[in-house]
């Protein structure tokens, strides 16, 4: 877990949520620098969550952000399991339906932004509903 200095000068541990939020904010800024436009963050639908929803041209991009300190156990990208992919697909399906869309009517893709140590990897179209 990351640490941050406090007013007293002694560092305190960030919660897992705070650490995740910080990496998601960094991913958002990085992707905006690449030309994507922000739509929403931390979208919850029936037990699933999508970290970021952005737009690249006419494509709606659902983004999973992952961070790992090292690649010792496969790195950040490897942590997006089939089970997690299924949950992201279901959450996106529900979000699209709530916005009068579907995978059939909206051009969309699923990306992963993986931070492993100081390295960033952007995996466009990492998986889809046909995977």
Curated annotation (Swiss-Prot):
Residues 1-21 are annotated as: Disordered. InterPro entries: Restrct_endonuc-II-like (IPR011335), tRNA_endonuc-like_dom_sf (IPR011856), UPF0102_YraN-like (IPR003509). Residues 1-19 have a biased composition (Polar residues). Gene3D superfamilies: 3.40.1350.10. It comes from the Bacteria. One of its GO terms (molecular function) is nucleic acid binding. Belongs to the UPF0102 family. This is UPF0102 protein YraN. It comes from Escherichia coli O1:K1 / APEC. The gene is yraN.
